[in-house]
Swiss-Prot record:
<dbReference type="InterPro" id="IPR019927">
    <property type="entry name" value="Ribosomal_uL3_bac/org-type"/>
</dbReference>
<comment type="subunit">
    <text>Part of the 50S ribosomal subunit. Forms a cluster with proteins L14 and L19.</text>
</comment>
<keyword id="KW-0699">rRNA-binding</keyword>
<comment type="function">
    <text>One of the primary rRNA binding proteins, it binds directly near the 3'-end of the 23S rRNA, where it nucleates assembly of the 50S subunit.</text>
</comment>
<dbReference type="GO" id="GO:0006412">
    <property type="term" value="P:translation"/>
</dbReference>
<protein>
    <recommendedName>
        <fullName>Large ribosomal subunit protein uL3</fullName>
    </recommendedName>
</protein>
<dbReference type="InterPro" id="IPR000597">
    <property type="entry name" value="Ribosomal_uL3"/>
</dbReference>
<keyword id="KW-0689">Ribosomal protein</keyword>
<dbReference type="GO" id="GO:0019843">
    <property type="term" value="F:rRNA binding"/>
</dbReference>
<keyword id="KW-0694">RNA-binding</keyword>
<dbReference type="GO" id="GO:0003735">
    <property type="term" value="F:structural constituent of ribosome"/>
</dbReference>
<feature type="region of interest" description="Disordered">
    <location>
        <begin position="119"/>
        <end position="145"/>
    </location>
</feature>
<dbReference type="GO" id="GO:0022625">
    <property type="term" value="C:cytosolic large ribosomal subunit"/>
</dbReference>
<dbReference type="InterPro" id="IPR019926">
    <property type="entry name" value="Ribosomal_uL3_CS"/>
</dbReference>
<keyword id="KW-0687">Ribonucleoprotein</keyword>
<dbReference type="InterPro" id="IPR009000">
    <property type="entry name" value="Transl_B-barrel_sf"/>
</dbReference>
<comment type="similarity">
    <text>Belongs to the universal ribosomal protein uL3 family.</text>
</comment>
Length: 209
C-alpha cells in the first residue's frame, strides 16, 4: 500500500493494482452458450513444449484457444458476466480506462494463508485463565454432547487451516487511474498478498457502469 493526497489535502491510503495484458479471448452469448459473458486472459504463458512437466508451458488446447484471439496463451483466464458483450471484440485489450476516479468496485482475491491455527486466532474465541490452577489456556472447550448426540456436529468451530480462501471486499472506491502505467489506485486494502492476482468488477450493490 501507499498513500496519496486528495484535492482538499486529505491523506488517502491506497493499494496500487497493476492491470496489464488483459485480452478478450472469447465472447459468450445467450444463443450459443445460454448466457452472456466475456472471457478475459491475463499474463502470457510460455509456448507449448513437448514433454514439458512445468505448468509454465501452455498445452495444445490452450494455444489453439488463444490463437483465435490472435494472442499468446494466458496463465489466468476468468469470465465476467452481466456485461455489454457487444462493446467488446475477441482479441481486444481491456485497459484500465474501463474505470474512472470515483467508481465503486468489488475486488476479489485469495486471502493470505496463515497455516494451521488454533480456535482463538482462527475464530476469535476467548482463552481460559492463565493462572490460579487453570487446566486449559488456549485449548478449545467442549465440542459436543455425550451419549445423546455421540458425535461432533458438522461445522463446529475448531482448530484448522486458516486463510487461503476466496474473499471479496465490496464497495471500494477508485481514487485514481493511471493509463500510462496501467495501474489503478484503490482506496483501502484488497485481499491477498503482494503481487497476488485480483479480480476487479463494478460494484454489485452500487454499480455505476
Amino acid at each position: 500500500m501507499t498513500q496519496v493526497f486528495g484535492e482538499n489535502g486529505e491523506l488517502i491510503p491506497v493499494t496500487v493494482v497493476e492491470a496489464k495484458e488483459n485480452v478478450v479471448l472469447q465472447k459468450k452469448t445467450v444463443e450459443v452458450d445460454g448466457y452472456n459473458a466475456i472471457q478475459v486472459g491475463f499474463e502470457d504463458k510460455k509456448a507449448y513444449k513437448k514433454d514439458a512437466k512445468s505448468n509454465k508451458y501452455a498445452n495444445k488446447p490452450a494455444e489453439g484457444h488463444a490463437k483465435k484471439a490472435d494472442a499468446a496463451p494466458k496463465r489466468f483466464i476468468r469470465e465476467f458476466r452481466n456485461v455489454d458483450v457487444d462493446a467488446y471484440e475477441v482479441g481486444q485489450e481491456v485497459s484500465v480506462d474501463t474505470f474512472v476516479a470515483g467508481d465503486v468496485i468489488d475486488v476479489t482475491g485469495v486471502s493470505k494463508g496463515k497455516g494451521f491455527q488454533g480456535a482463538i486466532k482462527r475464530h476469535g474465541q476467548s482463552r481460559g485463565p492463565m493462572s490460579h490452577g487453570s487446566h486449559f489456556h488456549r485449548a478449545p472447550g467442549s465440542v459436543g454432547m455425550a451419549s445423546d448426540a455421540s458425535r461432533v456436529f458438522k461445522g463446529q468451530k475448531m482448530p484448522g487451516r486458516m486463510g487461503g480462501n476466496t474473499v471479496t471486499v465490496q464497495n471500494l472506491e477508485v481514487v485514481q487511474v493511471d493509463t500510462e502505467n496501467k495501474v489503478i489506485l484503490v482506496k483501502g486494502n484488497v485481499p491477498g498478498p503482494k503481487k497476488g492476482l485480483v479480480e476487479i468488477r463494478t460494484s454489485i450493490k452500487k454499480g455505476n457502469k
